[in-house]
Amino acid sequence: MRTTKKYMLGFIGCGHTGMAIARGAVAKEYLERYQLVVYDHHDTNMKTAKGERFGLAKDEADVAENAHIVLLAVNPTQADAVLEKLKEHQPECLLSIVTGLSIAHIQSILGKDTQVIRAMPNTPLQIGEGSTALCKSENCKADEYDFIFQMFAGMGVARTIPEDQMNAIVAVHGSVPAYVYYFIECILKDAVSRGIDEEAARALLVQTVIGSGNLLKQNAGKPIEEFINEVASKGGTTIEAINTFKELNLASIIHEADEKCVKRAEELSH
């Protein structure tokens, strides 16, 4: 994708997720360091960006004027104020990873001619194992969207979904790393309470999650129930645990947690 701008991708906000994207794009050799420019109002984040040898912008307007695609990675409560600052500088394409910030709302401030891409990555992106859901405005050009899609796909898995599913998808991958960590933590605490060495239990647990995930990935067409049945055989130990989950209606608990997660995403939407 060609551009007349000095930088290919400019970051407004470069905290945990923004920096993970920047580092991932460079690590995967999708972009060179000199093609990235960063602005963050936190000095510590700017120092980190400087240490990474990324370009440094003096403010939001500087990013918009010099980057072909502007990546918005700020807190939802700060988004409108930043968009107002960008209005005069008309970014060619805005990539937003801000939860709940709709394409229509972005274009209502920046103008309907602005190309907009929304992305929802998750934290394993930091190690190139993330998953990202994306959607785009009707006027977004194929070159711009393909460029961003492939960037995220290079850091894990990427899928295009309708914008009206962006809030619901948070309960599928956006928040799910925390679910997984919580489940592991519960099992780990229980193991330690039974006298099992914490380091050994954690190592075994983590590898079990990695291995189980890879099995699912390598057998994408196989029903998940079959994987469960292969472990939870009749009369064995695992089936006792699975039956307990069912008796306590774990599925209902997960559904309720997802409902509240999605509801909060909808509350943040505008």
What function would you assign to each model-found segment?
Residues 44-45, 78, 187:
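Conserved short alpha-helix immediately C-terminal to the canonical SAM/SAH-binding motif I
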Residues 105-115, 131-169, 181-219:
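Internal alpha-helical scaffold of NAD(P)-dependent oxidoreductase catalytic cores
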Residues 2, 206-270:
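NAD(P)-dependent Rossmann-like dehydrogenase/reductase catalytic/cofactor-binding core
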Residues 169-178, 228:
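A short glycine-threonine-serine/GTX helix/turn-capping micro-motif
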Residues 36, 63, 79, 197-205, ...:
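Small-residue helix-packing motif on alpha-helices
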Residues 1-58, 62-65, 130, 192-193:
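NAD(P)+-binding Rossmann beta1-loop-alpha1 motif at the extreme N-terminus of oxidoreductases
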Residues 21, 37, 52, 60-134, ...:
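Rossmann-like NAD(P)(H) cofactor-binding subdomain of soluble oxidoreductases
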